[in-house]
Amino acid sequence: MTSGEVKTSLKNAYSSAKRLSPKMEEEGEEEDYCTPGAFELERLFWKGSPQYTHVNEVWPKLYIGDEATALDRYRLQKAGFTHVLNAAHGRWNVDTGPDYYRDMDIQYHGVEADDLPTFDLSVFFYPAAAFIDRALSDDHSKILVHCVMGRSRSATLVLAYLMIHKDMTLVDAIQQVAKNRCVLPNRGFLKQLRELDKQLVQQRRRSQRQDGEEEDGREL
């Protein structure tokens, strides 16, 4: 396959990737979004920002960072962080926990996950997303989501949050995060995010159909 053919196939794969929003429904746009494959998704990450520092803001008041950021209590306090989600919680990973921040005004949530393609991180998608959402519901809050490198586990949980609570497709979420930080979940996590994407897209389409049927019923 030539490079030109790759570009064309990728363009076709996600050129129609759109958020399934009521506005689009009203405007009559065709909902033809299809979850891209792992290779196409990885290309989206590669096209993102080369920026990779200890911590980056990827959504208002939502930051992805590394172990060094999480361990630096002074800088966390100075920067005004109020919540920490550790996606590498545990003795053999980033061993912090609530006690580590006990004398600080920080709420902690730990996810004991390994950065392995075989690890099922999806069971933590909704609890982690709920923690992030509660944090961001307060205008004065600021949350750090971290793992060891701030590239795979933490990025996966942030992507899941944007998909679940901000009604983004996986493509939307990747583009939002990748433009602000160089991240790349492992293939296993990408597969789990693809499954979440398919489920959420189906739910939104069902909801839109039901809303449309109810609207038609009121007009009769």
From Swiss-Prot:
Substrate binds at H146, C147, V148, M149, G150, R151, S152, R153. The keyword Cytoplasm applies. Its EC number is 3.1.3.16, 3.1.3.48. GO terms for cellular component: cytoplasm; nucleus; protein-containing complex. InterPro entries: Atypical_DUSP_subfamA, Dual-sp_phosphatase_cat-dom, Prot-tyrosine_phosphatase-like, Tyr_Pase_AS, Tyr_Pase_dom, TYR_PHOSPHATASE_DUAL_dom. Disulfide bonds: none annotated. Gene3D superfamilies: Protein tyrosine phosphatase superfamily (3.90.190.10). Residues 1-29 are annotated as: Disordered. It comes from the Eukaryota. GO terms for biological process: glucose homeostasis; muscle cell differentiation; negative regulation of ERK1 and ERK2 cascade; negative regulation of MAPK cascade; protein dephosphorylation. GO terms for molecular function: MAP kinase phosphatase activity; protein homodimerization activity; protein serine/threonine phosphatase activity; protein tyrosine phosphatase activity; protein tyrosine/serine/threonine phosphatase activity. It is found in: Cytoplasm; Nucleus. PROSITE patterns: TYR_PHOSPHATASE_1 (PS00383), TYR_PHOSPHATASE_2 (PS50056), TYR_PHOSPHATASE_DUAL (PS50054). It catalyses: O-phospho-L-tyrosyl-[protein] + H2O = L-tyrosyl-[protein] + phosphate; O-phospho-L-seryl-[protein] + H2O = L-seryl-[protein] + phosphate; O-phospho-L-threonyl-[protein] + H2O = L-threonyl-[protein] + phosphate. Residues 54-202 form the Tyrosine-protein phosphatase domain. Keywords: Cytoplasm, Hydrolase, Nucleus, Protein phosphatase. Dual specificity phosphatase able to dephosphorylate phosphotyrosine, phosphoserine and phosphothreonine residues within the same substrate, with a preference for phosphotyrosine as a substrate. Involved in the modulation of intracellular signaling cascades. In skeletal muscle regulates systemic glucose homeostasis by activating, AMPK, an energy sensor protein kinase. Affects MAP kinase signaling though modulation of the MAPK1/2 cascade in skeletal muscle promoting muscle cell differentiation, development and atrophy. This is Dual specificity phosphatase 29. The gene is DUSP29.
